[in-house]
């Protein structure tokens, strides 16, 4: 599968961590088989000492039932409010990741207003499953403007929600990575 290939690449490249910025599943009511495959791939990352940070999005939001099984304790899942998590790389660099997970299908609040970059030395990454406010092609979820992201002074923004690869800004990088596997013929993957 496409996800298996991404995990294989991460292991081969010996990356420090992987960020999943939402919509790993297409629906909240995901199959047990899909969840088991997902968990198995995450276990491969953990076994390779690669960190995993997940923000669930509008397609795979985490309701009160959380999940049909527990994730490995080393898999970091962001809660429903923006929060900071720390990761220490093997090279000795402190990385601070900021994000939140959807706890309902429709998050229309301006969650970006709740992101607060810490004062710690290190690399700061914002993770946001949301939509550029000016984009009227999709329903608006967790809207933001490019200027709002720039003003947060993160070193990088890992975005989710839009399934098409887009570079919104270069300094700092504000990136929609797109999806790794198209859901239909109109999505490239």
Report residues per predicted region:
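N-terminal active-site segment of His-dependent metallophosphoesterases
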Residues: 1-35
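His/Asp/Glu-rich metal-coordinating catalytic cores
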Residues: 17, 30-189
């Amino acid at each position: 599968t496409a996800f298996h290939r991404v995990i294989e690449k991460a292991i081969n490249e010996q990356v420090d961590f992987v960020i999943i910025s939402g919509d790993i599943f297409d629906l909240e009511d995901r199959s047990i088989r899909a969840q088991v495959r997902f968990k198995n791939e995450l276990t491969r990352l953990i076994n390779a000492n690669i960190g995993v940070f997940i923000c669930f999005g509008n397609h795979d939001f985490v309701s009160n039932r959380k999940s049909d099984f527990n994730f490995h304790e080393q898999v970091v899942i962001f809660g429903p409010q923006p929060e900071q998590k720390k990761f220490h790389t093997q090279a000795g660099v402190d990385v601070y990741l900021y994000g939140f997970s959807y706890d309902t299908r429709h998050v229309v609040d301006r969650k970006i207003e709740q992101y607060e970059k810490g004062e710690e030395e290190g690399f700061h990454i914002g993770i946001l499953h949301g939509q550029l406010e000016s984009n009227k092609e999709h329903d608006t979820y967790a809207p933001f403007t490019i200027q709002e992201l720039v003003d947060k002074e993160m070193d990088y923004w890992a975005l989710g929600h839009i399934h098409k690869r887009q570079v919104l800004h270069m300094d700092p990088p504000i990136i929609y990575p797109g999806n790794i596997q198209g859901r239909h013929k109109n999505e490239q993957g």
